[in-house]
Amino acid sequence: MEGGRAPACTTQVSFVCQRCSQPLKLDTSFKILDRLTIQELTAPPLTAAPARPGDAQEESALSEEAFTEGRQDGVSRRFIPPARMMSTESANSFTLIGEASDGGTMENLSRRLKVTGDLFDIMSGQTDVDHPLCEECTDTLLDQLDTQLNITENECQNYKRCLEILEKMNEDDKEKLQTELKELALEEEQLIQELEDVEKNRKIVAEDFERVRAEAERLEQEEAQYQKEYCEFKRQQLELDDELKSVENQMRYAQMQLDKLKKTNVFNATFHIWHSGQFGTINNFRLGRLPSVPVEWNEINAAWGQTVLLLHALANKMGLKFQRYRLVPYGNHSYLESLTDKSKELPLYCSGGLRFFWDNKFDHAMVAFLDCVQQFKEEVEKGETRFCLPYRMDVEKGKIEDTGGSGGSYSIKTQFNSEEQWTKALKFMLTNLKWGLAWVSSQFYNK
């Protein structure tokens, strides 16, 4: 009855290619396989050696056994390997449709699938290729087999030619070949021995190479270290060379300065005596005063300080010690000290004003200084009789005479004297000191 039927079930089953794993649609000839066709497909490949009678029976029995249906309670049970079949919803798969009560139709389809799967298993077991294959993979496989077949045929032809050559040989040729074979065997042994020796030598050479390589690495490291040290020493050398050149230049410059200083007259460089108009000057300080040119007393005092310092230096250079007075150079406040009266100081500086006209210490100091210049002249004349100053000095009167010129005498004092005559007397005194300076320089610095 229709009411007693179970609902229909649908199962889609398809085979897949064992190379590209694409689903396959089997040919319709797989549905009409008879026993004879199955035996032909499952028969083992033909061999050159005759087969034993029992082998054919065993193979037939195996074939029969492989396709024997396992029936139990009227139901055929067979597991379809997932590697060859898969359930899909594809349109290329075939569909098993049946009812639970219609056991005959399902049994036939299951049997057919079992036979097909077993057939593919047998084909895969007899060859090196897994089945089933799609058309494209089959064409590719056939091309590979054709290539292998061509290679095998060529090898077979070569073997046939070698066999024909061997069959044509006589006994002498065989003996000759045997002898040659023995010689080749001996040569092979020798070559093997040589190869062993070469291998031993190779090992020795490899060990030597490793040792030499290690030594080379060590030498490279030492070379790098030496190069580093060399660069450091080179840098130090360059620095020392620069320093040496600098020192040499400094020495050269110092030597030039020394030579220049040796040629330089200290007195001439230190005390520059010249004139500026009616004034005598020492180191650019004017010594004297005119009504038209009222020189500041600070400048006059500074000029007297330089004059005292000059005469003091000349006396020390000659080893002269003055009598009656001692020169005390003290800048613009220089003075003379009386040796007979230690408490008596004769200042060679003045501030001007009314006190200047009534205080005669300044005049006494200038006369005392003129006395010291006269002592210097007399000391020089002791060793140099030809020495003579341009202007004669009269210490008692405190005057300087212009013997080579006008023949007049000029007082070095300020009291009861005009500024013009006082200034001229100071100018003549500086001229005498300039001559004394020149003589000392010629005696002590130009030798």
Swiss-Prot record:
Say which domain of life the source belongs to. Eukaryota
Which UniProt keyword terms apply here?
Antiviral defense, Autophagy, Cell cycle, Cell division, Coiled coil, Cytoplasm, Cytoplasmic vesicle, Endoplasmic reticulum, Endosome, Golgi apparatus, Membrane, Mitochondrion
InterPro entries, per the entry:
Atg6/Beclin, Atg6/Beclin_C_sf, Atg6/beclin_CC, Atg6_BARA, BH3_dom
- Annotated spans, Disordered: 44-71
Where's the motif BH3? 105-124
Q: Coiled-coil ranges per the record?
A: 139-266
Residue ranges of region Evolutionary conserved domain (ECD)?
242-447
Function statement: Plays a central role in autophagy. Acts as core subunit of different PI3K complex forms that mediate formation of phosphatidylinositol 3-phosphate and are believed to play a role in multiple membrane trafficking pathways such as initiation of autophagosomes, maturation of autophagosomes and endocytosis. Involved in regulation of degradative endocytic trafficking and required for the abscission step in cytokinesis, probably in the context of PI3KC3-C2.
Q: What is this protein called?
A: Beclin-1
Organism, by scientific name, is Gallus gallus
Q: Which gene name does the record give?
A: BECN1
